[in-house]
Amino acid sequence: MTAAEIKDKVFDIIVSRMGVNKDQIKMESKFSDDLGADSLDTVELIMELENAFDVQIPDEDAEKIATVQQAVDYIVSKQ
C-alpha cells in the first residue's frame, strides 16, 4: 500500500468514525482540537486504524499520535 493510499484510507476512517466531512480534514489537523475527538474517540480511532492496517499500536506510541499526519506517518513506517 502506498503512502497516498494509506492517507486516503485514514481519511475515510476519520470521516466514518468522527462524523466530519473529508474537506475538514487536513494533515495537520489535531484529533482533539480540530476534529472534536474526546479521549474515547481517539482510543476507538486508534483501534480502528490497527484493524484496518493490521498493525499493533502500543499505548506509548498511541499517546504520541495527535494529528492526522502522525497517524499516517506511523502506519507508513509499519508497512
UniProtKB/Swiss-Prot annotation:
What GO terms in the biological process aspect are recorded for it?
A: lipid A biosynthetic process
Q: Which keywords appear in this protein's UniProt record, sorted alphabetically?
A: Cytoplasm, Fatty acid biosynthesis, Fatty acid metabolism, Lipid biosynthesis, Lipid metabolism, Phosphopantetheine, Phosphoprotein
Modification O-(pantetheine 4'-phosphoryl)serine, positions: S39
SUPFAM superfamilies from the xrefs?
Answer: ACP-like (SSF47336)
Q: Where is the major localization of this protein?
A: cytoplasm
Q: How is it modified after translation?
A: 4'-phosphopantetheine is transferred from CoA to a specific serine of apo-ACP by AcpS. This modification is essential for activity because fatty acids are bound in thioester linkage to the sulfhydryl of the prosthetic group.
**By its UniProt entry, which Pfam families does this protein fall under?**
PP-binding
InterPro entries, from UniProt?
ACP, ACP-like_sf, PP-bd_ACP, Ppantetheine_attach_site
Pathway it works in: Lipid metabolism; fatty acid biosynthesis
**GO molecular function (one):** acyl binding
Mention any one GO cellular component term assigned to this protein in its UniProt record: cytosol
What's the stated role of this polypeptide? Carrier of the growing fatty acid chain in fatty acid biosynthesis.
- Similarity section: Belongs to the acyl carrier protein (ACP) family.
The molecule here is called: Acyl carrier protein
Q: Source gene?
A: acpP
